[in-house]
Amino acid sequence: MKERRFRLVTSNLIICAVLGLVLASALFALTPETPAAVEANNAVYEGNPESGRVALMFNVYEGTEYVEEIARLISERGWNTTFFVGGKWAEKNGDTVVRLAAEGFELGNHGYLHRDHAKLDAAGNREEIVITEKLLRAILSDLSDEQADAAVPPLFAPPSGSLGNTMFEVCEELGYTAIMWTRDTIDWRDHDAALIAERALKGIKAGDLILLHPTEKTVEALPSILDGIAAAGLTADTVTATLSATANEP
């Protein structure tokens, strides 16, 4: 009897172990790639610490009514910024895209449909990036090639910060740099202007890439953020300038 009970317990333990392995394998298969799982994480998380600059990066798929107010507040300081625009948004807001470029703002690539790039194959990654670039350049067709190159640099901000090996391979193929962030204000979720400003400014330093979105509370927080940047002896500029500039450059 004892031997039979022992065999039964042993069999049950083996079955549980096998089921556990199957479940773990299934969960692993369903889990998207994260930075830790990416073999070669070539994303940029911060700019040049000697630049004297920080970059305010606005990811834009909605909030059109706040975009131009954000641009105005930054322009009033004589500063600059980068708007990472979604292709679908740009398609519906071509006039705003033209005005931003005309005012000297940088327009990065945020994909066309805000898809999870860790789950896309090479064709899907390529399509999202290329369609958005072609769309932006078509909207800005009145610009010279040199002006368009400056306005639409090969910078890609993956939606939701979702990274994958295939995405990096496609970025390299297309000549794009994947841009992440040093600090995330989480303004899309937390509608609290004081909290947004605190997250943007706490421990701020040259080279920081600060992620924001066009929301009502972000606009409310922006004057405090800009004041805090100035108080730290820094200026706000585009991602390109923050990555490459040195303190003695204009």
Predicted feature locations:
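Binuclear metal-dependent phosphoesterase catalytic core
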Residues: 218-247
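Active-site beta->alpha N-cap acidic-glycine motif
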Residues: 33-120, 124, 128-144, 148-153, ...
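Basic- and aromatic-lined ligand-binding clefts that recognize polyanionic substrates
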Residues: 139-171, 217
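Non-membrane alpha-helical structural segments and their capping/turn regions in soluble enzymes
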Residues: 122-130, 194, 201, 219
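Structural recognition of the beta-strand scaffold that forms the well-ordered cores
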Residues: 55-57, 81-85, 106-109, 154-158, ...
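Hydrophobic membrane-insertion alpha-helices, especially the h-region
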Residues: 11-28
